[in-house]
Amino acid sequence: MASGILVNVKEEVTCPICLELLTQPLSLDCGHSFCQACLTANHKKSMLDKGESSCPVCRISYQPENIRPNRHVANIVEKLREVKLSPEGQKVDHCARHGEKLLLFCQEDGKVICWLCERSQEHRGHHTFLTEEVAREYQVKLQAALEMLRQKQQEAEELEADIREEKASWKTQIQYDKTNVLADFEQLRDILDWEESNELQNLEKEEEDILKSLTNSETEMVQQTQSLRELISDLEHRLQGSVMELLQGVDGVIKRTENVTLKKPETFPKNQRRVFRAPDLKGMLEVFRELTDVRRYWVDVTVAPNNISCAVISEDKRQVSSPKPQIIYGARGTRYQTFVNFNYCTGILGSQSITSGKHYWEVDVSKKTAWILGVCAGFQPDAMCNIEKNENYQPKYGYWVIGLEEGVKCSAFQDSSFHTPSVPFIVPLSVIICPDRVGVFLDYEACTVSFFNITNHGFLIYKFSHCSFSQPVFPYLNPRKCGVPMTLCSPSS
C-alpha cells in the first residue's frame, strides 16, 4: 500500500520533459512543473521557432517573468530521494527508476527498460524491442555460450589431470634417478675403497720386499766391511813388524788380498718403480650404468634335468655339480678313485628356451677351480665329441661360452682356424680378480652374448658379437671336474 503511494507521488514529481525526478523545479501559471534546465532549454527553442513560450504539456503561453521556483515540490523530491521502496515495490519486472513494467530491451545498452526509460534522454534514438521478441534469440546465444564454456571446462579439467599425472610421473622418475645416482656413487665409493686398500697393500708388500732385500744387502756389506777391516789390520801389522813377521805366510795373505771381490748390494732405482695410476672414474661409471641397464632384464633361470647328462642337480634346480668320484680297485686290490668320463653329457641346459628379447642371469662359481658357462643352441647329438678336449665349445657348434681352468686361467672359446678345425681358438682373458659370480647377458636381436665379472664391480669379461642364433638358445652350465657346485642366482639375491 505504502509502495503504491510512493509510486504515485513519484509520478507527480517527475519532469514531463526528461522523465526524471524534478531538479530545481520551476512552476508555470498553468500549474505544471519542470526542471529548471529542461524549461530553460524548451523556452529557448520555443522563442526561436514561434517567438513565444508555451507550456510543453498544455501549450498555454506564459511569460518568463511569471516563472517561479516551487519549493514545496523541491522538498517532496528531496524527501523522495531519501526514501527507498519496499521489496514489494522493487519487483524485478518493474523499473527501479519509474516503477513501470520492464517490457522493452535496449539493444545499444543491453538493458531491459520501461516505456518511460525509452523516452528519456538516456535511451533516445536507440533500437528497442519487446522483451518477448529478443528473449528466444539471446536464450539460444546463452545456451551456445554455456555449452562452449562447459566444453572448455572439461578440456581444462583434462589438462589439469594431465598436468597432475605428468607431475607425478616426473616426481617418480626423478626419485628413481636419485636412487640410481646414490647407488652408482655408493658402488663407486666401494670400488675406490677397494682400489685404495689394494694399492696400499701393494705398497706395503713392495715396502716389505724392498726393505727386506736392503736389510740383507746391508748385512752382507757389514760382513764384507768387517772382513776388509781385518785383512787391512793384518797387512798393517805385517808392514810394521819384523822381517820374520812380514814373510811368515805372505803368499797366503797376498792370495787373500787378490781374491777380495766387493759384492755390490742390490739397489732399487726409484725411476723404475711402478707408477700409481688413479682409476678411470668415467669408465667405472659407464660400467655401472651398463650393468645396471642389463640387470633390468634379469630372468629367473633354473636348469632342466635330462637323462643324458651326468651332472648332479639340486632339488630347487639351481645348483649343478659334477658327480662324485667312483672307487676303482686295480691290480692286487689297489684302491683309487676316478671321475666318470666327462664327455658331451656333462653339460646341462637351463629350462628357459630363448627365441627373442633381452635376458640376463647370474651364476655363482665361488670356490670352483674349473667351470664353463654361457649360452648353448641346444644339444646336438650329431656333433657329439670329446668335451674333455673342449673340441665342441665353438660358436659354429652352437656354444658361446667362457670357462675357468686350474683356478686362474679364464678363457673364451671362439671358432677354430681353417687349419685346425677340431680345436677351438682359445682366447685368454685378462681377469684381475677371478670371478666368484658371473653375469650373462643375451641380446637375441642384437646377436650378442656378454659376460660380466660381478666380483670385480661388474667389469666386462668378454663379449661375443655377430652370433648366429638360428634356433632357440638356452643357458648352459658345465661344472667340469670340480666337485664344488655352481649356482644359478635368483633375481632377488
Swiss-Prot record:
Enzyme class: transferase
CDD domains, A to Z: Bbox2_TRIM5-like, RING-HC_TRIM5-like_C-IV, SPRY_PRY_TRIM5
Record keywords, A-Z: Acetylation, Antiviral defense, Autophagy, Coiled coil, Cytoplasm, Host-virus interaction, Immunity, Innate immunity, Metal-binding, Nucleus, Phosphoprotein, Transferase, Ubl conjugation, Ubl conjugation pathway, Zinc, Zinc-finger
Coiled coil: 130-241
A cellular component annotation (GO) from this entry: cytosol
Main localization category: cytoplasm
InterPro entries: B30.2/SPRY, B30.2/SPRY_sf, Butyrophylin_SPRY, ConA-like_dom_sf, SPRY_dom, TRIM/RBCC, Znf-RING_euk, Znf_B-box
ZnF endpoints (RING-type): 15-59
Domain B30.2/SPRY: 281-493
Name listed for the protein in its UniProt record: Tripartite motif-containing protein 5
